[in-house]
Amino acid sequence: MISSLWIAKTGLDAQQTNMDVIANNLANVSTNGFKRQRAVFEDLLYQTIRQPGAQSSEQTTLPSGLQIGTGVRPVATERLHSQGNLSQTNNSKDVAIKGQGFFQVMLPDGSSAYTRDGSFQVDQNGQLVTAGGFQVQPAITIPANALSITIGRDGVVSVTQQGQAAPVQVGQLNLTTFMNDTGLESIGENLYTETQSSGAPNESTPGLNGAGLLYQGYVETSNVNVAEELVNMIQVQRAYEINSKAVSTTDQMLQKLTQL
């Protein structure tokens, strides 16, 4: 009888985790390049009273056995790297990725991180950086006298300078792809880092080796579907209520037992 309380409790914990994931998705509905998550669950160990296939007599075996479950637990929060919409900004330093790949940036400790947020800016040294100040890799320096910046679909960065008719190439924006995008670790600030599960980074020119293309003057918006998340929220709410009902029903049954 008591076990049902703990089983229902695992259900409540699982739905709370599910709700946390949905809330985070909705909170980041306006975050550039954000990829929504979904909670993945698995059942816990079973109490086996009769083994499936065990002998019930000399001539017969149990077709299904008797196993009592002990609940559920969250096993993963899978990040879904589907394409977000491209929103036009008309800012020459904004770049959106259409397809696979990430921009590579350098962290303060010299290690690499990866992002889909292409709302770039220029720092005091003319270096192309993210909105958080992380330098884009390979480093790209925009001259102080640049009149305009052009970023091609293939990542070639060129500028027009005063007194020069022809544009001058100042750098190359490459894209990094991974065998398993879901295996990347989210570290906040729209950044991911490589893990053993993601596989090694593969740097490519946009449009080659499976990498996407770049669109200047656009940013990729979040791939969160608000309507879908609200439907998921209703389902979670109902599941939470059902598990709460299981707790209260078990409590009522225990009260009846104590009255005997």
Curated annotation (Swiss-Prot):
It is found in: Bacterial flagellum basal body. PROSITE patterns: FLAGELLA_BB_ROD (PS00588). It comes from the Bacteria. GO terms for biological process: bacterial-type flagellum-dependent cell motility; bacterial-type flagellum-dependent swarming motility; chemotaxis. Keywords: Bacterial flagellum. GO terms for cellular component: bacterial-type flagellum; bacterial-type flagellum basal body, distal rod; bacterial-type flagellum basal body, rod; cell outer membrane. Belongs to the flagella basal body rod proteins family. NCBIfam families: FlgEFG_subfam, flgG_G_neg. The basal body constitutes a major portion of the flagellar organelle and consists of four rings (L,P,S, and M) mounted on a central rod. The rod consists of about 26 subunits of FlgG in the distal portion, and FlgB, FlgC and FlgF are thought to build up the proximal portion of the rod with about 6 subunits each. This is Flagellar basal-body rod protein FlgG.
